[in-house]
């Protein structure tokens, strides 16, 4: 006659056990600690330390222009001796047109270009503008994924703006330097070409022989000028802080279309 009371007694016993277990757990559990401002600052600091820094402006600009920069090399004979020159250029059209400085190619009978993907090609000089020291080359062999550079009006430049130069100084291919616009509307007789160039962009990003014909970029990696010359009072071809670039706005007659 007592069997009908066994289940309720067992259930009640289980409930009591659970309640006691919860009371013991709450008694033994450490009380939560209040976060201080220092705790929050330390947590934020640890998070920032584990977050990689964003790429630099020069890095972003270089990645934008990298597929469009070429090595320009010439071969010629002077006084019975083989002579070669090396400079830079920038692709301005999908058809393989390349903008560079005229003094880079001169009157050399053989001009070769090396694209970013390693494609090498002979090139023809299709446009010569000696009064601006500019030339346009046409490559005979093109990469499958040729990417022209984006041109931007140099009229938007201001003194103090950051600029980036890409070229091949002393044959060190695809070197990147950055600096600022030091002056606008400069006039200079280029030692390389002997031509008096006007309306030049003066900048202090390091350039040396091999940079000529390469692009001068804004922060977005757009071409605002073509590196043309450097000034050194000692008549040595090494950089001392003064470089000159031809504004991209002044290249319209060479490239056949205005910049963006």
Regions found by a protein language model. Give the residues of each.
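Terminal peptide-recognition signature
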Residues: 44, 70-72, 89, 95-100, ...
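Extracytoplasmic/secreted envelope proteins and their assembly/folding machinery
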Residues: 37, 41, 45, 58-62, ...
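A conserved glycine-rich beta-strand in the N-terminal activation segment of trypsin-fold
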Residues: 53-60, 75-95, 119-122, 147-150, ...
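N-terminal activation segment of mature serine protease catalytic domains
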Residues: 25-84, 101-102, 110, 253-257
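Solvent-exposed, acidic/flexible segments
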Residues: 33, 37, 51-55, 63, ...
């Amino acid at each position: 006659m007592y069997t009908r009371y066994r289940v309720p007694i067992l259930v009640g016993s289980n409930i009591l056990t659970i309640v006691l277990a919860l009371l013991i757990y709450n008694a033994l559990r450490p009380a939560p600690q209040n976060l201080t401002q220092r705790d929050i600052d330390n947590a934020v600091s640890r998070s920032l330390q584990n977050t990689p820094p964003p790429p630099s402006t020069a890095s972003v600009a270089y990645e934008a222009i990298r597929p469009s920069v070429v090595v320009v090399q010439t071969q010629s004979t002077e006084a019975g001796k083989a002579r070669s020159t090396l400079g830079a250029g920038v692709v301005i059209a999908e058809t393989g047109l390349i903008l560079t400085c005229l003094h880079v190619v001169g009157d050399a009978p053989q001009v070769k270009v090396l694209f970013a993907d390693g494609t090498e090609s002979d090139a023809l000089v299709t446009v010569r503008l000696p009064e601006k020291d500019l030339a346009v080359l046409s490559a005979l062999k093109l990469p499958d994924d040729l990417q022209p550079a984006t041109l931007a009006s140099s009229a938007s430049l201001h003194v103090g703006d950051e600029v980036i130069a890409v070229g091949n100084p002393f044959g060190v291919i695809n070197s990147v330097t950055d600096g600022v616009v030091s002056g606008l509307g400069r006039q200079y007789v280029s030692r390389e070409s002997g031509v008096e160039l006007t309306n030049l962009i003066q900048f202090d990003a390091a350039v040396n022989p091999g940079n000529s014909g390469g692009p001068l970029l804004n922060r977005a990696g757009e071409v605002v000028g073509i590196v043309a010359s450097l000034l050194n009072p000692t008549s040595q071809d090494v950089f001392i802080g003064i470089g000159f670039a031809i504004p991209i706005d002044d290249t319209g007659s060479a490239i056949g279309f205005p910049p963006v």
